Amino acid sequence: MIEFDNLTYLHGKPQGTGLLKANPEDFVVVEDLGFEPDGEGEHILVRILKNGCNTRFVADALAKFLKIHAREVSFAGQKDKHAVTEQWLCARVPGKEMPDLSAFQLEGCQVLEYVRHKRKLRLGALKGNAFTLVLREVSNRDDVEQRLIDICVKGVPNYFGAQRFGIGGSNLQGALRWAQTNTPVRDRNKRSFWLSAARSALFNQIVAERLKKADVNQVVDGDALQLAGRGSWFVATTEELAELQRRVNDKELMITAALPGSGEWGTQREALAFEQAAVAAETELQALLVREKVEAARRAMLLYPQQLSWNWWDDVTVEIRFWLPAGSFATSVVRELINTTGDYAHIAE
């Protein structure tokens, strides 16, 4: 299995280094739900601004304040502890008057607004995230500048970030131990983290191998293509390759890679043979996903940061802004720009 740091680059390995997250204010994330709260209902959506505390910790504190069970507080996604992040929590408080959440106090956390909503906010139920990053001590401004220009046109590999695999790869290691021993894992969080790490690692491997051996944007017979921004996909045939290639070049269609699991992967013929060969050595992880009935799915191989802009504060400091759809990783953008240094180079987003 290829480690995250050794995955193939789209724009070649960066020539320079830089410091990511010199302080939490250098990594700002604003969650974009993609919908407006209902203004009524048995749930309360709470928009918070936090710094120095993780999402689960804040959710548990909110549950305690509201005197409800922790499972009654949900969120769309985990946000990094070592960053300034704005996100929504959702508390189920039926048949009660609206509580005064301005009285909720937690160090490093501030309630920005709260409003009634009809439905529970479920994991993954967000449109995306807006990022503002500051890279410091950049050693090669010209290289970073050119890479930013190239990323605007060609995007970056849509890798799952190192944080998906846990500190030091602990989640992937747990998945491997589980696969090898077949010992039941009763902790639901561990099961979820480990299965997610296993499938993500296989996806990364497929994308890395495709980058090594071919133009990642070149449609081949049997590729599974999806409309940009959509989840559905269809299979490319030789008769359609020229037209499909034009649509891929226009970013109307995206070539996908497998998220392996049970059931058909989605590709056929040449593309399927390539994907199977790319992860042929990882039989234990594949068997684990099938055994645990994790359904195979597809994910775009390339990621195009939207609204990408940057501003050099000086020759060694650059502020970068962009928006990514849900499930994408800002660190997968940064790794195409610089070799990161610092304690938080690979801490979870």
Curated annotation (Swiss-Prot):
One of its GO terms (molecular function) is tRNA pseudouridine(13) synthase activity. Its EC number is 5.4.99.27. GO terms for biological process: tRNA pseudouridine synthesis. InterPro entries: PsdUridine_synth_cat_dom_sf, PsdUridine_synth_TruD, PsdUridine_synth_TruD_CS, PsdUridine_synth_TruD_insert, TruD_catalytic, TruD_insert_sf, TruD_pseudoU_synthase. Substrate binds at F27, N129, F329. It catalyses: uridine(13) in tRNA = pseudouridine(13) in tRNA. It is an enzyme of class 5 (isomerase). Residues 155-303 form the TRUD domain. It comes from the Bacteria. The keyword Transcription does not apply. Keywords: Isomerase, tRNA processing. The active site is at D80. The keyword Isomerase applies. One of its GO terms (cellular component) is cytosol. Responsible for synthesis of pseudouridine from uracil-13 in transfer RNAs. Belongs to the pseudouridine synthase TruD family. HAMAP family: TruD. This is tRNA pseudouridine synthase D. It comes from Escherichia coli O17:K52:H18 (strain UMN026 / ExPEC). The gene is truD.
